[in-house]
Amino acid sequence: MAGQYGAYLAQGYMMTPAIAALLTRLFFYPPKFSDANLRFGRLKDYLKFWLISLGITGVSYISFTVLGGITWDFSGRVFLDKLAQQFAVTGQDIQAALPPGFTPSMMLLIYTIGGLTVFNVIPGIITGFGEEFGHRGFMFPMLYKIKPWIGIIIGGLLWYLWHIPLAFVIPQATKLPFWQTTLNLLILALGSICTHTYLAYVYAKSESIFVTALAHITMNNTAASFSYYAVIQNQVACNLGLTLTMLLTIAILYFRKELRVFAKYFCATKTG
């Protein structure tokens, strides 16, 4: 399944963690929403984790370049071709379908700047909430209370497995040989554990599901903004670069003793 219908289905699928967590909290979880961290959070945390997530994406694209995963094309042709394809799927011509006064180049500028800034707030926090309310806001704490490594490693793998169905509704840019597909899966599994750990850290540090949603969607949107000027040469190298970047992120948090926030957070919630 691909094209417009695949995109709609993917958007609906992204809300399933929030729906599952909502129903579980309403009918099967005695504390209900008392530990859901639905507080707005501190403004400085929004700024802090927006900048950190933006930086992580920037470093990942540097690694893509160094590893030969991408080449750069600052004409924006990559974005313009994708935009034209999206309109073609619906049977529309790009020039005729754009709002009056808008050109494809203007759309490129709007999407680039928006992906780095305002799109991460509206609708970013709303779309990011769909995953975070379920995964970091409910699944992660439940697993962590069993054993910390279960919350981190098993939680990360479950989050990774949850993403796999998206491959069937979102068209893939390239078809890879079996060995590359297998290697990709292993690399992405490790990368997912690291990314899950980073987002769980944001959740425990900020104690706000909305700050966590912002951190998550900022990585997604800034990656999209950079991708408008990047031509993929080797998908495996790109995925390796992303995983190495997230490993570096977790290593920095570890050596700065920032990961101790988990023990502090769960001790506080247990006594509270």
Feature names for model-found ranges:
Residues 112-269:
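Transmembrane helix-loop-helix hairpins at the membrane interface
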